[in-house]
Amino acid sequence: MTEFDDCSHGASNMYLPGCAYYVSPSDFSTKPSFLSQSSSCQMTFPYSSNLPHVQPVREVAFREYGLERGKWQYRGSYAPYYSAEEVMHRDFLQPANRRTEMLFKTDPVCGHHGASPAASNFYGSVGRNGILPQGFDQFYEPAPAPPYQQHSEGEGDADKGELKPQHSACSKAPSGQEKKVTTASGAASPPGEAVAEKSNSSAVPQRSRKKRCPYTKYQIRELEREFFFNVYINKEKRLQLSRMLNLTDRQVKIWFQNRRMKEKKLNRDRLQYFTGNPLF
């Protein structure tokens, strides 16, 4: 049982807690019989029920805005043939959880505003212009957009703006260095050599890796025979093989180096195969 339920059963002083005004008892002349029963908890307030500067809600609404009851357009869940008193009682006889939500969350009655905005928004718990006439739409203020999003977006744009000049400066620096190197090389070399280099670079494509030259069967057989007798070949024997096999001295030397590495690997594989234990 909420605080609003305790206080709504009072007969004389209908004071809504948290609100800035009293509700006149004349507005509740047609309340049901169970609301007129004396409540078990009588709450006495030191405030006077007759405040001269606060006027009843409906009198303010009808006098200030010049709206007649017959011109109200009902667009909510209530039919137009219901009287204003029944509509008011339907709003106040809702479940407790909805009433508390209406009073403390959605309804602007309990806000600390003046009498006119509170009076204009008294029946606005269903939704925007759900029961109220169209003349009350001007008193609904749309929720302002959160300013921190704009601020964060502005900061993000500023950060991007700061990063772009840095990136452009970094990109300009290598290009400037390359220009300096090219100018220095151009100044060091005479113009004739520069023209020759340009012509050579345009005519000759980019140098690729030299193609592999496989040995013939005869060359491999003679090299294997020599490797069988001498793993490390001396210089005289290497020159003799190079003349006989029509190879260069460097080719014979590299072949023996590769053959020794291959033999070492084969010996390790044989040992691992026979022992069954890997050797590291």
From Swiss-Prot:
One of its GO terms (molecular function) is DNA-binding transcription factor activity, RNA polymerase II-specific. Its main location: nucleus. InterPro entries: DUF3528, HD, HD_metazoa, Homeobox_CS, Homeodomain-like_sf. PROSITE patterns: HOMEOBOX_1, HOMEOBOX_2. GO terms for biological process: embryonic skeletal joint morphogenesis; regulation of transcription by RNA polymerase II. One of its GO terms (cellular component) is nucleoplasm. Keywords: Developmental protein, DNA-binding, Homeobox, Nucleus, Transcription, Transcription regulation. It is found in: Nucleus. Residues 135-211 are annotated as: Disordered. Residues 152-165 have a biased composition (Basic and acidic residues). Residues 208-267 bind DNA. Belongs to the Abd-B homeobox family. PANTHER family: HOMEOBOX PROTEIN HOX-A11-RELATED, HOMEOBOX PROTEIN HOX-D11. Sequence-specific transcription factor which is part of a developmental regulatory system that provides cells with specific positional identities on the anterior-posterior axis. This is Homeobox protein Hox-D11.
